[in-house]
Amino acid sequence: MFNNSMQGGLVIRPSNDRDKPFLMNLYNSTRDDLKHVDASHDFIEELIEMQFKAQFEGYGEQFPNAFYFVIERQQEKIGRIAVDFGHNEVRIIDISFIKAAQNKGYGSVVINALKSAAEQNKVPLTLTVLHSNVPAINLYQKLGFKIVDNKLPHALLMWLPESKTARFSVN
């Protein structure tokens, strides 16, 4: 798969049931869109919890062989990533960090580790991102990803290992 000990003191480990409160809080922190709904606080929290469960179940249906990891730094949980190591690609399904760990280069470290895994397996590394998430798109492009499908609301981005660039056409 990929090395679980990375640059910057980051460690990636498989998530487990004890991580559920952290994962729920992390998901909650990414759903500012739902926090502005005109409804009671309890209703919004319940809605976010339902969305969290639906996301996890949806990933399970769409990517039944996916792996779910917690990202730690100095034994503190700072993020999560879901990855599908398929036969024809390595797919980043989801990646997110707590607010205190954002914009510190940790995402680049994790993605570069996945690029190494894709390179070793001679397959592309792919992901989708919302068009509205311009900072993420800019980061991915800086890391060598190209937009290969641009259907709303998501863009499909792909990074190709050196050994694959001649076999794939990327615009």
Predicted regions and their residues:
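Acetyl-CoA-dependent GNAT
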Residues: 5-6, 17-20, 24-93, 98-99, ...
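A short, internal acetyl-CoA/4′-phosphopantetheine-binding micro-motif in the GNAT/acyltransferase core
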Residues: 95-103, 129-130
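Conserved acetyl-CoA-binding loop-helix of GNAT-fold acetyltransferases
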Residues: 103-116, 138-142
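Conserved GNAT acetyl-CoA-binding A-motif
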Residues: 119-128
